[in-house]
Every structure is written in C-alpha cells, then in structure tokens.
Amino acid sequence: MVPVSNEWKAQHDELLLPETFIELSYEITDPQLAVDANTSATNEESFSEAENITDATEKNPERYGTLEQNEWGLDGTFNYFDETPEDAGYTTSVLSGADAKYTAAPTITISFAELQTALIPGLTITWGEGIGEWAVSFRATVYNGTTKIAQMSVADNESVVSKMSMDLQNFNKIVIEIFEWCLPHRRCRVTEVFLGIRETYTKAELLGYTHSESADLLSATLPKSEITFGLDNSTGRWNPNNPSGVEKYLLERQKFVVKYGMNVNGMVEKIKGGTFWLSEWNTPANGIEASFTARDAVTFMNDVYTGPRSGTLKAIATAAFKQANLPVMSDGSARYIVDDSLADITTDFTEDTTAYTIVDVLQMVAHMGCCVFYQDRGGMVRIEPHNEEITDYVINRFRSYTHPEITISKPLRAVSVSYGENLTETLPVEAQGEVQTVSNEFINTAADAKRVANRTADVLKGRKTISGEFRADPRLSALDVISVESKYADNKVAITEITYTTSGGAFKGTYSGRIVG
C-alpha cells in the first residue's frame, strides 16, 4: 500500500472529497536511444559527469556553494561542496564572461555506434536544475556521419527545461553548443539531455481513465497491471494522416509514469500510481478520441528463456530477469527483486525440453517458492513471500456503493501436487469436498511438493472470496491486506484484483479478494 499522510486518510472519511488529480507523464522516444548513447563534452570540471546526462535515470542535483559570483549564499539553501556532488551532470571548468557569453562554446557530443532509424520528435534539455539556471543561447545539430540532417538554434530561452521540437531520424551524432548563460561569471551546467520529448497529461486532458491491477496469492496466474485512457483527438493531433501530428512517434514500450494527488489543506499531496509501457493504441482518422493501453514490465518477458535449467530458484529467477533486459529504475538500479529465501530451494528441469518463456519461468519460480509475483507502484518487479500483515485501510459501509458479494467455494478435501516422474504428494484437508491438483515442472522432490501443498491449502481452505464497488482511494494495491465491512461481519481480505476508473471526478473502484481471516 502506498503511504500517505494522516490528513489524506481523514479526507476519505468526509462526505465530499476535495479535488483529486492524475498526472500522467509520457516519454516520446525510442527507449533504446538512452542505452546506446555515448556522451562526451568539452571543458569539463574535475567532478563533471557528462557521460551520465543521457542515461534517462532520475536526477536530483544538489545546490552547492562555489566561488562563482553570488554562488555561495548564506541562506541555508547551499550544501558544502565536496569532490563528488550528487548528480553533477555536465559542469564546465570555464565561466561565462561579464556579458554572460562563453569565449569558447561548451559543447556536448552524443554519439551512437549504429545509425538510429527510429523517429523521435526532438530533444529535452534540463539545464542547471539544482541552482535554477539555464542557457539563453544554444544550438543543436544532428548528423548522419558528416552530413548535417537537422539543426535548431535558440537565442532567447528563459527556462530551466528546453524542448527542441524537430523530427530526428537516421542519425548517429548530436552536437549541442552553448553560447550564452543566464548570468555572468557562471559555469555552464546541464543536468540531463533527454533524447525525445516529455509530455504530461492531467485530468483535464483525459477523456477517460482506468487503472487495473491483479495478482494471485499462489502465483498460479500471471500478475497484470495496466492503464487505459483516452485523449482528445478533435484537432487531429493523433490522426495518423496528419503530417504534423504526433501519431508517427508512437512506439511500443514508451514509458508512462502515473501519479495520483489530492488537495490536502490547500496543498496537493501526490502518490505513486505506477510505471507502465505503451502496448496498444488506436488513433482513428475519423475519431475524436485517441485511446491508449500501457502495461507493466511483464510485457518485456515474452522471449524464450535461455538461462540455466538447474540451480537455486533465486539464481534461475535472476538469470531470467537479466535476460529480459528490463529498463533500469530511475536511480539506475535493477528493476527486480528476488527474495533471498529462494536461494535455499533448488530445481532441475534440464530433461524438460519445453520452450518456456521468461515470464513462464518466473511464475513457476514464484509458485514453487510459495511467493507472490507482481510489479509494485514504484515499477519494481518482485518475487517474495506475501506480506500478510493487515493494513489500516477499511472498506466500510460508508465507502461502499453496494453491500459486498461473498462467494463460497466447495470444501477442500485435499491438495494433490505432482512431482518428479509421475509421483504425487497428497495433503488431506477436510473429510469431504474437492481435490485441488497442482502441477509445476520445477517441483522435483517430495519435500518441495509438500511445501507447495501446505501453502495451497492455507490459501484455499478459507473458501470465501469477496467483491464489491466502492469510493476508491488510489493508495490501495493488489495483494494489500485490508478490512472489508459486510452486513454482518468484518472481514480480513487479501486483495487479488482492483480497478480504478474516473471520468473527471473522484475515483470509483471495484475490488475482489480472498477472505483470509
């Protein structure tokens, strides 16, 4: 569950909610560009990190005091300088003159080993974000070998973030020259050069929005997290036949980052909504709405697994994640976590010739290891034991639109787990009822089969599932354990599926889950 303030929680107990917000950030780029880019620069200071400004990771530059003019304030907003300031980016050793111009233009060169054929709509340059300064005059030139294919000059910039809109395709080098800074006697600073354009959509631009999550307590089915939304196409901006439109830039796996917010005591409190990658879109030439679907990182895991077929579950899962080559997190770290408990469990499926996909392998690892498999709101893909601790979230009758529906399955007589060469481990549960059969090619031993049988029985023997509609708080995620008030009882519920929808007002939600206590 996403942490929020006590004031946020209190607002959801009020009859009328304050204004809520959606912020959907979209990166219009080819995701491979950041991986392939090799960046260098002239006149670098000793602590400069020009090589990192195109890696597409999140930057948090600090403000540190230097001997540049008026850059050692005593107002408490400056950090002491050290040899390696955080996210220094490109920082020059030369200073602008009294007229704020540079005698020799600081120059950034972004080169690629191969010709880049994907079409992108331009560049986004973030200048000295930590100190709130920018270049006034600069130029970007794009090359294919020695041939100049595009150039754009700016002479009057007044913003820390500069968007340079121009079609870029079939290039292998970009050169950015900075001629004038916003202040005299200052170093040139560049926090990031994003190879593409970033756009942000709010509730005002969204014609409809749905966020759905599902995950299985036994990892018997694949997790799923996705958003679907519509954007206004009445002007033809997304029309595929519009030569100046943006449909031509759409590529699978372009990243969307969602944040939700609410007005709390006059300030907007924001929480993580998730990280998704573009999977499908429909931009009809005659339609007034363009629709989009973006999904979680499972979309990267459909290749056939080629890693080791014996060893610990942790080693096999790690190999699968590495093969998937998931985009790194915003801080540059790997986008997956495999619980250490899986280092104590082994398997061997070398004799099995089935061509499993990466996601198949990860699901079977999670299932055999009695773990859940899901992507969290921060975009991290996790395989770990389910956290069964109950949270403070309550779907009470005040928040429910209808009484929750409870479904009771047939009694569980036994769990039968197959393993090895046609062997079976059977765990008795009740005197009568149905037998739940379990099959996982990774399960090789009776001990492993018994562990899986016990976990299966623990989850299924409660028999009750619950579902309903409610005035949703978007901090709630699949696999959270919450309280649900029904007409005659309070239920401890592990959420297995949740959906949020809005057409501009407060979120309306549906949920389903298993009663676990």
Predicted features along the sequence, with ranges:
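Assembly/oligomerization scaffold segments
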Residues: 1-308, 367-368, 462-470
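Generic solvent-exposed, charged/amphipathic alpha-helical segments
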Residues: 257, 314-325, 363-366, 480-481
